[in-house]
UniProtKB/Swiss-Prot annotation:
Gene Ontology molecular function terms on file: DNA-binding transcription factor activity, RNA polymerase II-specific; RNA polymerase II cis-regulatory region sequence-specific DNA binding; sequence-specific DNA binding; zinc ion binding
Residue stretches of biased makeup (Basic and acidic residues): 12-21
Region annotation Disordered: where it falls in the sequence: 1-26, 647-668
Entry's transmembrane regions: none
Organism: Schizosaccharomyces pombe (strain 972 / ATCC 24843)
PROSITE patterns: ZN2_CY6_FUNGAL_1, ZN2_CY6_FUNGAL_2
UniProt name for this protein: Uncharacterized transcriptional regulatory protein C530.05
Keyword annotations from UniProtKB, A to Z: DNA-binding, Metal-binding, Nucleus, Transcription, Transcription regulation, Zinc
PANTHER family: TRANSCRIPTION FACTOR (PTHR46910:SF36), TRANSCRIPTION FACTOR PDR1 (PTHR46910)
Length: 762
């Protein structure tokens, strides 16, 4: 036997070389003893058992196992298993199988007349899906350098997992890899070395240029200073000195942050951006000492620091620093009514305004990162002073101008308050435990609140009338529009991902009332806002950039769910326009968006492939409908068996380089560019559906789900919902988002000083 050999003398050598009289032994049993499972004495040349039975004694050499890598792999599996068990333990005990239809007894006040039903696919039925589990739990991302970040269910990461679920099977794993990024570990570029160099303060002439740029760009968004007040504090050469001759660190730090923001506002080269960062680093070493002085001036400095982190696209730093600002504000009692203290009216209003700016930033940063808000509404009774849009710019309103009598600060506070309530009721830990009926009730409630807020705005301030916005305040109103659209998406996002059918009839006739259609329409609006916005200062563009990317994912999901809808071509053009706008911003904004571009190109390519496959299926389906067969008795054609491999048409692909792309019709037949034909095809499908329901011998495999009338809103045809069950897509989710080392959802996160990316919209 070739695999058998006798033991070598080296293996049989005794432990002590001087004792040569002992018999040679093998430290393991021979093959026969191992086979019979009896004790072997290991003697050589033959053991006692083999000698007594008269058979040859043979030992087979067995290779030693290398257990190092195997143990590491097992340890990794155990860790991942523990994480999954922890996720399941936290979700399954709260599983509630209540009915998914809102009954009159459970309908909130003023909603008895609302038609609110749910589709065939229950959100609770999907609780075992990875996307829904991660949406409930949030995601803990581990980066390649070992740092960890938590992203809640309102962040971009949550919605992109649903996008990956819908896209699974449409395109190749290689194309979809840019969405999951599971193989590469994350979705941001490697960190560059930190440059700790500082810059000296500029001359008075250059400083005045920076100050002027600050008041034209950043101060109108959060007017913590007036020009007169600022020059009164920082206009003299000795503004940094105390009476005893020591340095006033608070004044110095606040002045430097203003210069840094002004330098950033006029930066048109990378050198100027680096100079702004170097100026700002002068404050990092003294920030702790400054914060020890609990005063209103300290609060102003920390708030300006948060604004700077916004300007350099560091949302996680914004969220952390806002937490410090909130604690300082609460220490100073700014969350309580300032009018009740023994201070002057102007001082009380100044403190109240700064408090509400902090409140605004707290809600916006939490919405983008998916983390909890710091301020709780139950603890706040601060007044909202009157502050018109003209006050933001230090202008006197023209006589008779309605904008001069409208409290714009109060409108911003009300909007961000609704954002906080939505985050708490729909995306917090307790909110994610709600069943489908409760979620639909909350959607109706918050949509009514947001719609009432919208109707309270002056006509020229309403987001749909953005072309009527006065030029002097366009930045403020565009930013407010972006927050409004994003809040609308947050309210109705569950309807899209969980297939909830909610009819918001309180919006009235002539308006979109379907919840899914409202979510998609809001996404289209915010992407159009991003594409059409030009000459805006970087802070606003970077905030809108995040919301535009999130909205692109919503539009991507819409295309995958209804690839035969007549508006899909426009939606695809919308995705391409966002990509081209980001290319322009990347060129002139000194930011790196390579991975964002890859993700967008992956979505565009996948959407094109889905539309092409759906059209090909519709062609085969319409050919079968054109025959004279009795569809009532013959059943539906087995479209799932149509071989797409035999198709000569190859779906268009997006090149790896970030070049301008336009949508071209690649339909096998131009007939699909005609929305009338799609409606005709849709009617044929619905008629077949009715015939199949009336047939006694209909195969269950070909039954259609019921079609709700409200699915026809916003050019969304139900043809896809009837076709997708036969779509030759894979049933399982190929993209793995469950691993800890996955994609950083804030795709533009930590871009500024750490040279990473920025983060998390009718």
């Amino acid at each position: 036997m070739e695999n058998l050999k006798s033991a070598s003398p080296e293996e049989d050598s005794p432990r002590h070389g001087d004792n040569m009289g002992k018999p040679k032994r093998i430290p393991r049993a021979c093959d026969m003893c191992r086979k019979r499972k009896i004790r072997c004495d290991g003697k050589q040349p033959a053991c006692s058992n083999c000698v007594s039975h008269g058979i040859p004694c043979v030992f087979t050499a067995r290779p030693k196992r290398r257990t190092g890598q195997r143990q590491m792999y097992i340890k990794s599996l155990v860790s991942r298993l523990e994480q999954m068990e922890s996720t399941l333990r936290s979700v399954i005990p709260n599983y509630d199988q209540q009915p998914d239809i809102i009954h009159p007894s459970s309908t909130p006040k003023n909603y008895h007349d609302l038609n609110c039903t749910k589709g065939e696919t229950s959100s609770d039925d999907s609780t075992d899906d990875i996307a829904f589990l991660n949406e409930k739990m949030g995601t803990l991302v581990t980066t390649p350098i070992g740092s960890q970040k938590y992203f809640g269910s309102s962040s971009t990461f949550s919605i992109i997992q649903h996008a990956a679920k819908f896209a699974s099977g449409v395109e190749s794993d290689k194309v979809l890899e840019h969405l999951s990024m599971a193989k590469s570990g994350c979705l941001f570029d490697p960190d560059e070395s930190f440059d700790g160099s500082k810059a000296e303060l500029p001359s008075s002439e250059i400083a005045n240029i920076y100050i002027d740029a600050y008041f034209k760009s950043y101060n109108p968004l959060f007017p913590v200073f007036t020009r007169e007040n600022f020059y009164q504090k920082f206009g003299s050469p000795n503004c940094f000195k105390k009476p005893d001759g020591s340095i006033d660190l608070v004044n110095y730090a606040s002045y430097v942050v203003v210069l840094s923001l002004g330098c950033l506002a006029i930066a048109d080269t990378e050198e100027q951006v680096s100079r702004a960062n170097a100026l700002f680093k002068n404050t990092l070493g003294i920030s702790i000492e400054v914060t020890k002085d609990m005063s209103f001036r300290t609060l102003v400095f920390n708030f300006l620091t948060s604004v700077y982190y916004c300007a350099v696209s560091k949302p996680n730093a914004v969220w952390l620093n806002v937490g410090v600002v909130v604690r300082v504000a609460q220490t100073l009692g700014l969350h309580r009514n300032s009018a009740m203290w023994s201070i002057g009216k102007e001082d009380a209003e100044e403190k109240a305004r700064l408090f509400w700016y902090i409140y605004y930033l707290d809600r916006v940063s939490s919405m983008m990162t998916g983390k909890p808000v710091a301020f709780q509404d139950d603890d706040i009774d601060q007044m909202v002073p009157f502050y018109s849009i003209y006050c933001y710019y230090g202008l006197k309103p023209p006589e008779g101008d309605p904008l001069g009598t409208f409290n714009f600060l109060e409108a911003e506070v009300q909007l961000t308050r609704i954002v906080g309530q939505v985050l708490k009721e729909l995306y917090s830990v307790s909110g994610m435990k709600s069943n489908s009926s409760q979620v639909m009730e909350k959607i109706l409630e918050f949509d009514l609140l947001l719609n009432n807020w919208y109707n309270s705005l002056p006509d020229c301030m309403q987001p749909r009338n953005r072309f009527k916005i006065p030029k002097f305040c366009s930045s403020n109103l565009i930013l407010t529009s972006a927050i409004y659209y994003s809040c609308l998406i947050l309210i109705h996002r569950h309807s899209l991902t969980k297939n909830l059918q909610v009819n918001c009839v309180h919006r009235g006739t002539g308006s979109i009332t379907d919840s899914q259609a409202l979510c998609i329409a809001a996404a289209r609006s915010i992407t159009n806002l991003f594409v059409e916005s030009v000459d805006l200062q970087p802070l606003i563009m970077k905030i809108i950039m995040y919301h535009a990317f999130t909205s692109s994912i919503i539009i991507f999901i819409s295309i995958l769910k209804r690839p035969l809808a007549s508006i899909c071509s426009e939606d695809l053009n919308c995705l391409i326009s966002v990509k081209n706008r980001l290319i322009s911003f990347e060129t002139h904004g000194f930011v790196r968006l390579n991975v964002v571009m890859d993700a967008l190109e992956s979505m565009i390519s996948t959407a094109q492939a889905a539309m092409q496959k759906a059209k090909q299926i519709a062609i085969n389906f319409s050919s079968n409908l054109a025959t004279n067969e009795d569809v009532t008795n013959s059943g539906m054609p087995d479209i799932a068996d149509v071989s797409l491999k035999s198709q000569s048409h190859v779906p268009p692909r997006i090149s790896s380089n970030h070049s301008d792309t336009s949508v071209k019709s690649n339909s096998p037949s131009s007939i699909f560019d005609n929305s009338g034909y799609l409606n005709s095809l849709n009617n044929s499908i619905l008629q077949m559906h009715q015939n199949l329901q009336n047939s006694s011998n209909t195969n269950d495999q070909y039954k259609f789900d019921s079609v709700q009338e409200n699915e026809l809103h916003a050019n969304i045809t139900p043809v896809l919902d009837q076709t997708m069950s036969m779509f030759p897509f894979k049933d399982q989710l190929d993209l793995n988002f469950a691993a800890a080392n996955v994609y950083n959802p804030n795709v533009f996160d930590d871009m500024g000083l750490d040279c990473s990316f920025y983060g998390n919209g009718l």
